[in-house]
């Protein structure tokens, strides 16, 4: 008898999980545009470069609490993010050119 009750308990848990999954599927998901994502990525790259530049200026002025290794790390992060942005742009341009060269 207890085995049947255990199986019924598992079945009821599965049904509850299925019901909650259906409820989550019915909620409208926010749409994120490609242009919006690209703009946000460019903003993050710009913010990284601005932070690195600010950190370097503070170090140059001799402000306390700004270490050289932090400045170098921030500058390297800014450089890497810029290179990543350039590579993404190159891939987008190549994809655009490929689409434009397709015959309809």
From Swiss-Prot:
Keyword DNA damage set for record: no
Entry keyword set: Bacterial flagellum
Localization per Swiss-Prot or TrEMBL: Bacterial flagellum basal body
Coiled coil: none
GO cellular component: bacterial-type flagellum; bacterial-type flagellum basal body; bacterial-type flagellum basal body, rod
GO molecular function term, any single one: cytoskeletal motor activity
Primary localisation category: other
Pfam family, one: FliE
GO biological process, one term: bacterial-type flagellum-dependent cell motility
Record-stated family: Belongs to the FliE family.
NCBIfam families attached to this UniProt entry: fliE (TIGR00205)
Stated name of the protein: Flagellar hook-basal body complex protein FliE
